[in-house]
Protein backbone atom coordinates (compact mmCIF):
# COMPACT_ATOMS: atom_id res chain seq x y z
CA UNK A 1 0.00 0.00 0.00
CA UNK A 2 0.98 3.66 -0.23
CA UNK A 3 2.03 3.87 3.41
CA UNK A 4 4.43 0.96 2.99
CA UNK A 5 5.84 2.42 -0.22
CA UNK A 6 6.47 5.73 1.53
CA UNK A 7 8.32 3.93 4.31
CA UNK A 8 10.48 2.03 1.81
CA UNK A 9 11.31 5.28 0.01
CA UNK A 10 12.32 6.96 3.26
CA UNK A 11 14.57 4.03 4.23
CA UNK A 12 16.15 4.06 0.77
CA UNK A 13 16.72 7.81 1.03
CA UNK A 14 18.40 7.47 4.43
CA UNK A 15 20.69 4.74 3.11
CA UNK A 16 21.70 6.73 0.03
CA UNK A 17 22.30 9.94 1.98
CA UNK A 18 24.36 8.25 4.69
CA UNK A 19 28.01 9.20 4.17
CA UNK A 20 29.49 5.87 5.23
CA UNK A 21 32.94 6.72 3.91
CA UNK A 22 33.13 9.69 6.30
CA UNK A 23 33.12 7.27 9.21
CA UNK A 24 36.38 5.74 8.03
CA UNK A 25 38.28 8.84 9.14
CA UNK A 26 40.87 8.08 6.50
CA UNK A 27 41.48 4.55 7.79
CA UNK A 28 40.64 1.09 6.40
CA UNK A 29 37.87 0.52 8.95
CA UNK A 30 34.53 2.07 9.95
CA UNK A 31 34.35 3.90 13.26
CA UNK A 32 31.39 3.68 15.60
CA UNK A 33 31.14 7.33 16.64
CA UNK A 34 31.70 10.83 15.40
CA UNK A 35 30.33 13.86 17.23
CA UNK A 36 30.21 17.54 16.20
CA UNK A 37 31.25 18.34 19.77
CA UNK A 38 33.90 15.68 20.36
CA UNK A 39 34.94 14.65 16.86
CA UNK A 40 36.68 11.26 16.82
CA UNK A 41 37.53 11.35 20.53
CA UNK A 42 35.99 7.94 21.25
CA UNK A 43 38.00 6.41 18.38
CA UNK A 44 36.18 3.05 18.55
CA UNK A 45 36.57 0.92 15.39
CA UNK A 46 33.85 -1.51 14.31
CA UNK A 47 35.65 -4.84 14.38
CA UNK A 48 34.06 -8.27 14.39
CA UNK A 49 32.66 -10.29 15.71
CA UNK A 50 29.71 -8.50 17.30
CA UNK A 51 26.33 -7.10 16.24
CA UNK A 52 27.66 -4.72 13.57
CA UNK A 53 28.01 -6.83 10.39
CA UNK A 54 25.12 -5.03 8.70
CA UNK A 55 26.97 -1.71 8.92
CA UNK A 56 29.65 -3.03 6.58
CA UNK A 57 27.12 -4.59 4.21
CA UNK A 58 25.16 -1.33 3.94
CA UNK A 59 28.34 0.71 3.63
CA UNK A 60 29.99 -1.47 0.98
CA UNK A 61 26.81 -1.59 -1.12
CA UNK A 62 26.06 2.14 -0.91
CA UNK A 63 25.54 3.63 -4.40
CA UNK A 64 26.59 7.08 -3.18
CA UNK A 65 29.18 6.90 -0.38
CA UNK A 66 30.58 3.35 -0.36
CA UNK A 67 33.54 1.99 1.57
CA UNK A 68 36.01 -0.31 -0.22
CA UNK A 69 36.01 -4.06 0.27
CA UNK A 70 39.35 -3.67 2.05
CA UNK A 71 37.56 -1.90 4.92
CA UNK A 72 35.54 -5.07 5.47
CA UNK A 73 38.56 -7.34 5.34
CA UNK A 74 40.90 -5.14 7.39
CA UNK A 75 38.25 -3.60 9.64
CA UNK A 76 35.44 -6.04 10.36
CA UNK A 77 37.56 -9.15 9.72
CA UNK A 78 40.68 -7.66 11.34
CA UNK A 79 42.91 -8.78 8.51
CA UNK A 80 41.75 -12.37 8.99
CA UNK A 81 42.25 -12.39 12.74
CA UNK A 82 38.47 -12.64 13.18
CA UNK A 83 38.65 -16.42 12.64
CA UNK A 84 38.71 -18.75 15.64
CA UNK A 85 38.88 -22.43 16.45
CA UNK A 86 36.77 -22.05 19.61
CA UNK A 87 33.97 -24.63 19.75
CA UNK A 88 32.01 -24.61 23.03
CA UNK A 89 29.98 -27.82 23.44
CA UNK A 90 31.44 -28.99 20.14
CA UNK A 91 29.81 -26.10 18.25
CA UNK A 92 32.33 -24.10 16.18
CA UNK A 93 31.86 -20.37 16.68
CA UNK A 94 33.94 -19.76 13.50
CA UNK A 95 34.39 -16.07 14.37
CA UNK A 96 36.17 -14.57 17.37
CA UNK A 97 33.59 -12.97 19.67
CA UNK A 98 34.94 -9.69 21.04
CA UNK A 99 35.67 -10.08 24.73
CA UNK A 100 34.05 -13.52 24.85
CA UNK A 101 36.25 -15.65 22.64
CA UNK A 102 35.85 -19.04 24.33
CA UNK A 103 32.10 -19.28 25.05
CA UNK A 104 30.52 -16.62 22.83
CA UNK A 105 29.06 -13.19 23.47
CA UNK A 106 25.55 -11.92 24.26
CA UNK A 107 22.91 -13.37 21.95
CA UNK A 108 21.81 -10.06 20.47
CA UNK A 109 24.90 -10.39 18.30
CA UNK A 110 23.07 -13.24 16.53
CA UNK A 111 19.96 -11.10 16.06
CA UNK A 112 20.47 -7.42 15.27
CA UNK A 113 22.22 -7.59 11.90
CA UNK A 114 20.02 -10.46 10.76
CA UNK A 115 16.80 -8.51 11.11
CA UNK A 116 17.89 -7.10 7.76
CA UNK A 117 20.21 -9.84 6.48
CA UNK A 118 19.44 -13.49 5.73
CA UNK A 119 22.29 -15.36 7.42
CA UNK A 120 21.56 -18.42 5.27
CA UNK A 121 22.82 -16.49 2.24
CA UNK A 122 25.97 -14.98 3.75
CA UNK A 123 29.25 -16.83 3.45
CA UNK A 124 32.76 -15.54 2.90
CA UNK A 125 36.38 -16.60 3.34
CA UNK A 126 36.00 -16.34 7.11
CA UNK A 127 32.73 -18.05 7.95
CA UNK A 128 29.32 -19.36 6.99
CA UNK A 129 27.09 -16.91 8.86
CA UNK A 130 24.23 -19.35 9.23
CA UNK A 131 26.55 -21.62 11.18
CA UNK A 132 27.83 -18.62 13.13
CA UNK A 133 24.42 -17.53 14.41
CA UNK A 134 22.95 -21.01 14.86
CA UNK A 135 25.93 -22.32 16.82
CA UNK A 136 25.98 -19.14 18.88
CA UNK A 137 22.35 -19.71 19.92
CA UNK A 138 22.83 -23.43 20.52
CA UNK A 139 25.94 -22.91 22.65
CA UNK A 140 24.08 -20.33 24.75
CA UNK A 141 21.27 -22.84 25.24
CA UNK A 142 23.62 -25.66 26.20
CA UNK A 143 25.49 -23.41 28.60
CA UNK A 144 22.23 -22.58 30.40
CA UNK A 145 21.29 -26.27 30.52
CA UNK A 146 24.69 -27.13 31.98
CA UNK A 147 24.34 -24.15 34.35
CA UNK A 148 27.92 -24.20 35.68
CA UNK A 149 27.19 -21.44 38.21
CA UNK A 150 24.13 -23.33 39.54
CA UNK A 151 21.68 -20.47 39.20
CA UNK A 152 18.08 -21.19 40.11
CA UNK A 153 15.74 -21.58 37.15
CA UNK A 154 18.25 -22.27 34.39
CA UNK A 155 17.53 -25.33 32.27
CA UNK A 156 16.05 -26.73 29.06
CA UNK A 157 12.98 -24.52 29.41
CA UNK A 158 14.60 -21.39 30.80
CA UNK A 159 17.58 -20.03 28.92
CA UNK A 160 18.89 -17.02 27.06
CA UNK A 161 21.73 -14.66 27.94
CA UNK A 162 22.00 -11.27 26.28
CA UNK A 163 22.29 -7.58 27.05
CA UNK A 164 19.47 -6.19 29.20
CA UNK A 165 18.61 -4.77 32.57
CA UNK A 166 20.40 -6.71 35.24
CA UNK A 167 20.62 -7.14 39.00
CA UNK A 168 22.20 -3.70 39.08
CA UNK A 169 21.66 -1.53 36.02
CA UNK A 170 22.59 -2.83 32.58
CA UNK A 171 24.81 -5.78 31.70
CA UNK A 172 25.81 -7.61 28.52
CA UNK A 173 24.98 -11.08 29.87
CA UNK A 174 26.70 -14.02 28.21
CA UNK A 175 28.21 -17.38 29.19
CA UNK A 176 31.11 -17.23 31.59
CA UNK A 177 32.12 -14.21 33.65
CA UNK A 178 29.15 -12.11 32.53
CA UNK A 179 26.58 -14.74 33.49
CA UNK A 180 24.87 -13.07 36.45
CA UNK A 181 21.86 -15.35 36.85
CA UNK A 182 19.67 -13.12 34.68
CA UNK A 183 17.50 -14.52 31.87
CA UNK A 184 16.44 -12.15 29.08
CA UNK A 185 13.38 -13.46 27.17
CA UNK A 186 14.40 -11.82 23.89
CA UNK A 187 17.53 -14.00 23.80
CA UNK A 188 15.69 -17.29 23.38
CA UNK A 189 12.66 -15.86 21.57
CA UNK A 190 14.65 -13.96 18.94
CA UNK A 191 16.56 -17.19 18.28
CA UNK A 192 13.48 -19.01 16.94
CA UNK A 193 14.92 -19.17 13.37
CA UNK A 194 18.01 -20.97 14.71
CA UNK A 195 16.61 -23.01 17.61
CA UNK A 196 12.87 -23.54 16.98
CA UNK A 197 12.36 -26.38 19.47
CA UNK A 198 14.50 -24.90 22.23
CA UNK A 199 12.93 -21.47 21.76
CA UNK A 200 9.39 -22.88 21.83
CA UNK A 201 10.08 -24.60 25.14
CA UNK A 202 11.36 -21.32 26.51
CA UNK A 203 8.30 -19.44 25.23
CA UNK A 204 5.93 -21.89 26.93
CA UNK A 205 7.89 -21.65 30.17
CA UNK A 206 7.96 -17.86 30.10
CA UNK A 207 4.21 -17.85 29.41
CA UNK A 208 3.63 -20.14 32.39
CA UNK A 209 5.22 -17.55 34.67
CA UNK A 210 2.25 -15.28 34.06
CA UNK A 211 2.31 -11.69 35.20
CA UNK A 212 5.50 -12.23 37.20
CA UNK A 213 7.43 -11.60 33.97
CA UNK A 214 4.64 -10.24 31.72
CA UNK A 215 3.41 -6.66 31.67
CA UNK A 216 1.44 -4.21 29.56
CA UNK A 217 3.93 -4.36 26.70
CA UNK A 218 4.75 -8.06 26.79
CA UNK A 219 7.57 -9.90 28.51
CA UNK A 220 9.70 -7.84 30.85
CA UNK A 221 13.21 -7.07 29.69
CA UNK A 222 14.77 -9.61 32.05
CA UNK A 223 14.25 -11.60 35.23
CA UNK A 224 16.18 -13.62 37.78
CA UNK A 225 14.93 -16.53 39.87
CA UNK A 226 18.13 -16.61 41.90
Labelled PLM ranges:
Residues 1-226:
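Ser/Thr/Asn(+Pro)-rich, low-complexity disordered segments
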Amino acid sequence: NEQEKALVEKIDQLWKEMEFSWYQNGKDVIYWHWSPNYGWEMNFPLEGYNEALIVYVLAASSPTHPVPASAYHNGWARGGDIKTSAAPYGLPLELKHNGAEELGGPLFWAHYSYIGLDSRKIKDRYADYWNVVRNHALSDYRYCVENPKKYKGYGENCWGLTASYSVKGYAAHCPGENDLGVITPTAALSSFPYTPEESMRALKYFYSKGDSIWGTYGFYDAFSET
